[in-house]
Structure formats: structure tokens, C-alpha cells
Amino acid sequence: MIRTIFTLIAFAVTNLFAQELPRLAAEQLKDEGLKSLGAFKLLQELTSIGPRLSGSAGYEKAVVWGKKKLLDAGCDSVWLQTVLVPHWVRGNVERASVHFGKKNEPLSICALGGSIATPKKGLRAEVIEVSSFEEVHQLGDKARGKIIFFNRPFDVTNVAVGEAYGGAVNQRGNGAIEAAKEGAIAVLVRSMTNAVDDVPHTGMMRYNESVPKIPAAAISTIGANKLSDLLKKEKNVTVEISLECKILPDVQSYNVIGELRGIEKPDEIVLIGAHLDSWDKGTGAHDDGAGVAQCIEAVKLLKQLNLKLTRTVRVVLFANEENGLRGAKAYAERDENKIERHIAAIESDYGGFQPRGFSVKTDSASFEKVKIFSDILSISAADQIRIGGGGADVNELAKFGTVCFELNPDSQRYFDYHHSSNDTIDKVHPRELELGAISLAILSLAIAQNGI
């Protein structure tokens, strides 16, 4: 009887210890992170490399840097995965002006990623403003030979700025296709931002091989407002555009991967990821240098605690998220995925602002299990867990039944900087950035030890 009592006490203490250890460890992760602010130091190094567009020398330097930093963080193994990526070059000429009466004024533009060039002498044509694809198609022959100006702004009443972006971004992505169907010779697209300034925001656009390819450029919000006003007041308004961008052959590049190996279930993977590439405007501090720095810092913090992880925590720094998702697709197609099981994949690709929580892409049964992590995530003030999307890169793993998460920071300022020359490290707060890294570390630890 006494032996039975001692056995029950020992079991209870062991069970309590198993429950308390993650919280105690999470407190330590928070304390160590906020003392060192290591994520910001990593971000300083990464952004000093400069822009990191796929196929560029900057990206290749970032690969070397990322591999070294994962080794320095104490990963048990670090390796590169080969990926074939697109190679688009912006060129040195991005120029536009609006002409009305005997006057002309400059417009602040930049080529959209993937656009073809204009003729060397540029092109000039009348402009027609629209706010939807339906309006383009209603123009019919009136669009032929014209520049179509997409000017649908974000819905400023939407508190979730990412949703407002989602409601406007099809103009950028598919505007050139839809305008070309009606015979347009170029498109201008209002920059994807709420900020009212003279800084254009780039981003990926697409072509359809069955539709003529036409040049595509983003125009700053101030420029868009100016052009819209002129079209209302003046007659025969034309715009002249010059771009010299090029689409070059695909090149070999890499995903950068490192991991802390699990002891009991090493083939069960908890992935934390971000994309290493950035657009060539600014230095990609928030998009997605912040996520890269947070992922490396998260495994560094976990390693410093010298924990025996039940499952493997793996960092993947993805190639080519911005203009193709080639890195994520290549990772999802690995032969090793037949042996390994990714039970969770957590992405940081929404800037380095104050974390609020995580959105989760999963079924309702798994979501109920995931909600229990909100308590431990309150340590880093990231305890708002909701059904939503995972990140663009990790969503490629959803087909395997992986529960996909995305870190959700405060979103109000993200699109002020997104894909623009404003995306630089002076816009990043060291403590906010670190709290994101701590949140990744806490959630990955909780899942590694408890599963889903």
C-alpha cells in the first residue's frame, strides 16, 4: 500500500513537472531574449547585405550568411537545398511623366516584379482610370492603345490591413493580363499601401502566355491621386513611361535549413520558417528580414536552454517567396517528406512589429488542440489564436496534413513599408522584433514537447 502511494506521488510529481517545465522554459526564453535583443543584431547584419531578390548577388550572400548564423545558433545540422529560381532584373531606368495641355509633371513609379521593358524610347498614350477588371472589359475597343490606370485603394475602414491588401492586390497581380485582353499597351497600378506618400511599392505581377505581354508599373499614392485629379479636370491627358527591366533565364539558388534534433521522435518536425529573399527596393527589413532574424534567434534561444526536445525543431529560410514560391514548393516536394512528418509549420512573414498571436490553417478538431497554447503564449503577449491562413511558404505543407501557423503582429504600419524603399531597419523596433522571436520559440517548444 505504501509502495502504491509513493508510486502515485511520483507519477503526480512527474506529470506536474512535465506540465510546468514548458512554462518555466518559456519564461526563461522571454527573459534571455529581452536581455540580449539578438534578433535585431541579426537583422542589422542581414540588411547590411542589401536587397536580396532571387537570382541576385545579394541573395547568394544572404545564403552564405544564413548558413553561418544557423551554425552559430547551435543547430545540430545545417544544409542547403538546391532550388531553380526566376531571375528578373529591374534595370536603371524607371521614369514616368503626365502630360496635359502644354504642361508635364513627373510621376513616381517603379516596375512591377516580372514586368517586361518598354521600348527604348519609352511609350506614351492616353490614360483611362478604372477600379476593377469589370470596368476594363466594359471599355472594349476604347482600351486599345491606351494605358490602363488601376486606382482602387485599400478599404480604409477595414481594421485588418492584410485583408484590405487582399481586396486590392489583384490589380497588381493580374492587371496587365486583363488590360492586355482589351488591347491596352501598358498598366499603371496604385501602390498597395494606405500610406499617402510619393514612394511607389513594387510586387509580383503575372503574364498569361495566351495574352500579349505589356509593361506594368506601380505608381505612388500621391502620384495616383494627382493623376486621378488631372483625368477629372483636364482633357487629352497622356502619360509617358520608360522601363528597362529584363527577364533572364532561371538560375540555381538555395533554401537554407538547420535543425535542433528531437530525442524521442526526431522524424516529427516542428518547422519555423521565413523567406530569405526580398524585393530590390529597400533592404527587406520587415519583409522578410524580420522573420529570418526571428527564426534564427528562436533556435538560438532554445539551444541556450539546453533542452532535450522530444521532436525536431527545424528552421527553413525559403528562397523565392516574393516572385514564385519556388523554395517552398521545392521543400514540399522533397523525398524526405515520405519519411518525416511535419506536425506543424510556423511562418513569420508579416513584419517585425509587436506580436499579437497566430493564425492557424487547420481543421476544427486540431484547432481545439491548438488553442491550449494561448496560455503559454501570453508570456510574450502573443496569445490571440484564431482560424486563418498559414504563411504562403508553409501552406505548401498543408497537403500533408501539417497544421500551418502564421505569426500575427500588429498590422497597421506594415504596408507603409512593404515592397518599397522605405523597408529599412530604422523602421524596426528591437523589442517588438525580439518578442516575435520569443513567440516563435515558445510555440515551437510547446508543440515539440506536447505535439498537437
Regions found by a protein language model. Give the residues of each.
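Bacterial Sec-dependent N-terminal signal peptides
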Residues: 1-20
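Soluble metallo-hydrolase cores and metallopeptidase-like ectodomains found primarily
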Residues: 23-25, 99-101, 109-141, 205-285, ...
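Second-shell loop/turn segments in exported
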Residues: 26-33, 48-57, 125-129, 160-176, ...
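A conserved hydrophobic secondary-structure block that centers on an alpha-helix together
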Residues: 139-142, 146-148, 152-191
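Active-site-adjacent substrate-binding region
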Residues: 180, 186, 190-191, 209, ...
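Noncatalytic luminal/extracellular "stalk/propeptide" segments of secretory-pathway proteins
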Residues: 44, 48-159
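N-terminal capping segment at the start of a domain
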Residues: 21-57, 83, 93, 199-204, ...
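Acidic/histidine-rich catalytic neighborhood of metal-dependent amide-processing enzymes
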Residues: 195, 252-255, 278-370, 452
